[in-house]
């Protein structure tokens, strides 16, 4: 995992991330995070709207106007996804983010399980990188952008879960902790 220039975020990611105490680390990992207009329309939480507005004003977030071709491809992706029984459903905002991730090389930020599986199950999207908040946190730690207490490395994940009420799968936390513990061991050498 390395630093990236651009990401595109969907609704579920932004709603959770807006509640996180270290949310500004997002803008240390990425130069710009794009937000499709379709995603903004879904946000109802006042806290999230205020945070997004401030970030747009500071040029940390940038509005992304989706082309009609991207909308059409996103609709096709939804149709394809509905034909794959093992793929949890995705809706238009997630599909738009995946389409833009594919065409522009942006990392897709989401908590949607269906969006996480698309690169594994649909070959056209196999090169799309999809991160949950968990991968973002690990990336921030590995690049020294988020301080980790190596005596309690799991604390960064539990802080996020406490702040957002979003629970990471235990298998995913275990894998993330292995990476962070490896980072801590290297730091001590």
Regions found by a protein language model. Give the residues of each.
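Ordered, amphipathic secondary-structure segments that act as subunit-interaction surfaces
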Residues: 63-110
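Metabolite-binding pocket within alpha/beta catalytic cores that recognizes anionic/polar moieties
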Residues: 12-15
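Feature 3881 marks metal-assisted phosphotransfer/nuclease machinery
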Residues: 1-6, 17-34, 38-51, 56-61, ...
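Short hydrophobic beta-strand that contains or immediately precedes a catalytic carboxylate
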Residues: 8-10, 110
């Amino acid at each position: 995992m390395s630093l990236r220039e651009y990401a595109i975020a969907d609704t579920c990611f932004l709603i959770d991330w807006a509640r996180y105490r270290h949310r500004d680390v997002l803008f240390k990992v990425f130069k710009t995070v794009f937000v499709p207009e379709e995603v903004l329309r879904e946000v109802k939480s006042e806290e999230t709207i205020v945070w997004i507005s401030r970030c747009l004003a500071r040029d940390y977030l940038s509005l992304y106007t989706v082309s009609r071709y991207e909308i059409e491809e996103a609709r096709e992706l939804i149709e394809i996804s509905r034909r794959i029984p093992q793929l949890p459903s995705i809706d238009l905002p997630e599909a738009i983010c995946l389409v833009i991730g594919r065409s522009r090389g942006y990392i897709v930020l989401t908590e949607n399980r269906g969006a996480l599986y698309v690169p594994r199950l649909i070959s056209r999207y196999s090169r799309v990188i999809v991160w949950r908040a968990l991968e973002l946190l690990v990336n921030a730690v590995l690049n020294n952008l988020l301080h980790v207490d190596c005596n309690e490395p799991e604390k960064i994940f539990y802080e996020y879960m406490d702040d957002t009420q979003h629970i990471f799968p235990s298998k995913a936390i275990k894998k993330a902790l292995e990476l962070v513990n490896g980072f801590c061991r290297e730091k001590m050498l």
